[in-house]
Amino acid sequence: MRRNKPLKSKLNMNNHKTYLAFNVDAVRDSKMENLHTLNLLGDWQKRYPNRFGFVNIDYINFIATHDDLVETTVKSDFFALMEKADNLMLVVTKDTDADNVWLNWQISRAVNRYHLPVIVAFKGESVVTDETLKEYWNHIPQKIKKYIGRDSARMCYIPLTETKVEKALGYFSVNTQTYPHNSTTIY
């Protein structure tokens, strides 16, 4: 894995907007880590609106409480939100379903249609290494594994910590053409 050099970014200012890829079913299940993670990210955004700009966090909460939405409407809304984003973030936990259709669909569209750099954050880790990827391999979405195998998407891997997330979201952007080096960049 290639490591990026430490970034010298402006703390307390992030103008980039981030699309959060998520598993709708997992967000609805209050016993799963995904709901707790979503609440953590929402809390960061409320406390530091100039540092975290998740374009779809309110929509995720809306979807979680409405299981009667029509698939075509949801996909249309996802496209509109992805179009506003500078990057895509995915949080991988021990509960992440690597085969979830909606999660893999979002990743595929964000990469193939909007060319968003992907930031994969591992919950519960303070540092990410090659061993982290091996440990979580069964929980990494199939689309991410496919991109790793083909080296066909620009992705970086970080621990889910406030500082690392802020720096990665503030640095990688489709609009500034700032991407991770390849599909296996550990940041």
Residue spans of the language-model regions?
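Conserved beta-strand segments of alpha/beta enzyme cores
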Residues: 51-53, 117, 154
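Conserved N-terminal substructure of TIR/SEFIR domains
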Residues: 1-84, 181-187
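C-terminal interaction surface of TIR/SEFIR-family domains
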Residues: 2-28, 43, 128-187
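Conserved beta-strand-loop-alpha-helix hinge of the TIR/SEFIR fold
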Residues: 81-107, 116-125
